[in-house]
Amino acid sequence: MNKIIILIALSLFSSSIWAGTSAHALSQQGYTQTRYPIVLVHGLFGFDTLAGMDYFHGIPQSLTRDGAQVYVAQVSATNSSERRGEQLLAQVESLLAVTGAKKVNLIGHSHGGPTIRYVASVRPDLVASVTSIGGVHKGSAVADLVRGVIPSGSVSEQVAVGLTQGLVALIDLLSGGKAHPQDPLASLAALTTEGSLKFNQYYPEGVPTSACGEGAYQVNGVRYYSWSGAATVTNILDPSDVAMGLIGLVFNEPNDGLVATCSTHLGKVIRDDYRMNHLDEINGLLGIHSLFETDPVTLYRQHANRLKQAGL
C-alpha cells in the first residue's frame, strides 16, 4: 500500500511539473513577437558573426524562438556614424522590400547607438523604435584620451591606423561579410566628446538636453529607449574584465568600462545601473556575466515584449 501511495504521489508530482513546464512554454510563445522586425546593429570593431561567434551572443536565437523576426546588420567596423548609418539605411530598405514590413525596430550597441539614430533621423517613416544599449551619445573619455595622446598627422597615428586596418581586415575575413569601407580616424572622431556633440546638433532626436537626464520619448513617430551597465569587473572568470577594469579607470564617474553612464542616456532610460560592463551588455565572451545580475539575454527579451506591448 505504501508503495502504491508513493507511486501515485510521484505520478502527480511529475504531472504537475510537466503541466507547469508546458504552461511556461505556452506562456512564452509570442512573448517576443513584435509587430515590426528587429534589427540588431553592432558597435566599433563589431561584426554579425565572427568565426562562428555572434556579436550579440545568443540574443537573436532567443528572440526568434518566441516569435520575433530578427536581423543582424553588418556595417563598417570603423567609420563615422553617418557613413555607418547610410550603410544601415540601405540594409533596412532591402529588408523592408523583402519582408513587406512597413517599419523596423532598431537596436544598437555602443557606436551602434548613434548609427541607428542617424537612420531614424533621416528616415523616421521607416523606423518604429530606436533602442540604444551602452550607446555613445555624448562622447567617451576613452576616445578623448586616445585622440589626445596620438597627435593628428603624426607617425604614431599612422602606425595606429595601420594596425587598426589590419585588425578590421581580419574581422572582415573571419566574419565572411561584405568588405565595407573602413576609416579608423573617422570612428575615433565620432566617439570623442567633440564629435558626439557635433553629431547631436544635426541629429538631436532623443538626446537629453540635461547632463544626465532623459530625452524625448517620441520624436517624429519614433520611440526612443536606452539602457546600460555601470560596472567594469563583473565576473572573475571573464578574462576581458581585466581590460574593462583598467580602461574604466579613465572615467571619474559611473561607467561600463568604455562609456560613461550619463553618455548612454537616450529617450526613455529603462535603467543605467545594471551590473554589466560594455561586453556584458551584448552577452559577450560566450555569455560570461555577473551571477548577481539579470541575464543580458533576458533584458533583450523583456524589451522585445515591451515593444510588443507598445504595438511596435
From Swiss-Prot:
Disulphide linkage map: C212-C262
Extent of the signal sequence: 1-25
Keywords, sorted A to Z: Calcium, Disulfide bond, Hydrolase, Lipid degradation, Lipid metabolism, Metal-binding, Secreted, Signal
GO molecular function: metal ion binding; triacylglycerol lipase activity
Domain AB hydrolase-1, chain residue ranges per copy: 37-228
Cofactor binding note: Binds 1 Ca(2+) ion per subunit.
Main location: secreted
Assigned EC number: 3.1.1.3
The organism's place on the tree of life at top rank: Bacteria
GO cellular component term, pick one: extracellular region
Alphabetized InterPro entries for the sequence: AB_hydrolase_1 (IPR000073), AB_hydrolase_fold (IPR029058)
Active site (record annotation): S110 (nucleophile), D256 (charge relay system), H278 (charge relay system)
Summary of the knockout phenotype: Cells lacking this gene do not show lipase activity.
Pfam families (alphabetical): Abhydrolase_1 (PF00561)
Annotated binding of Ca(2+), by residue: D238, D280, G284, I288
Note: The lipase chaperone LifO is required for the folding of this protein during its passage through the periplasm.
Function recorded in the entry: Catalyzes the hydrolysis of triacylglycerol.
Protein name: Triacylglycerol lipase
Higher taxonomy: Bacteria, Pseudomonadati, Pseudomonadota, Gammaproteobacteria, Vibrionales
Gene responsible for this protein: hlyC
